[in-house]
């Protein structure tokens, strides 16, 4: 049977989606991590699984997320889903496995085993990525033993940002990871400084030379690697990643560097640019020998201004469902919309209303529009409608 995922966008931006062939599951997996100082901790972490509902045995795609160093931001860390990418990879034939690691969101923030210190301290990148490596091994061991629909003989590991840094480390010990055939690094690195000015400047790592050294040390990769970086990466800039890859290659590493086009206002989220990385990703899969289905990438959700209202005219935000004739709920809706207007990045934010009166907003990350749509569709099958995207009302 041909497996499809159908997305229909009606002209007025109401969204109806059928995910009958794609299943999202949440598992709790016990892990033990040891940080760079030798301190150990054992607990359960949240793991998201994306798969086809037919439970056909499929190769795995293991995904490691990036990092937030501030405790408040780590606490706010949602369960990691990467829904647009995950659904695409499931369509390609993978079971997608995404742990939310110790130190983040639902997996517990009372400790931070990946603490990399400040720019004033000496970086210990090997010690700091070890908790990521440990959890990768343990979660994958769980998946290969407990999930009967996972092909234990072949899989790919993908990492984004700090997860990309760890991915290159894992490539150097791939013989310890069952079935691992290739590693993909999206925007990998550490100690990025997207907004701070000073000695190192904004948009660079404050330990770029340290990363050059460590990538050289990890160059004895046992499987092929693929590196994606965008020219407008606000964490690492356009030149540092090229130096890291050159250091890796000069020390004997094998892997292709893809210089991605600019991605919105911050190329650190270039993993969201599926149409542009897809050809390189597919070519890489052929090199690894892992079987996959060649399919078209999902189209970006397109929106356009409607002239319904000015963006800052809060009075025009519609009251729907339970918000009608309920001043208390109307006040809460307006308060949330005010927060949306205050978001610092006007090029990647979205506000969505549901016909029941529920609402969602999001800013930053890979794709704010996709995030609010996913949040709505996780609760409702229909009735989700975008109100504002970036600096425009699209209602």
Regions found by a protein language model. Give the residues of each.
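Alpha/beta-hydrolase active-site loop
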Residues: 114-148
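C-terminal catalytic histidine-bearing segment of alpha/beta-hydrolase fold enzymes
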Residues: 250-306
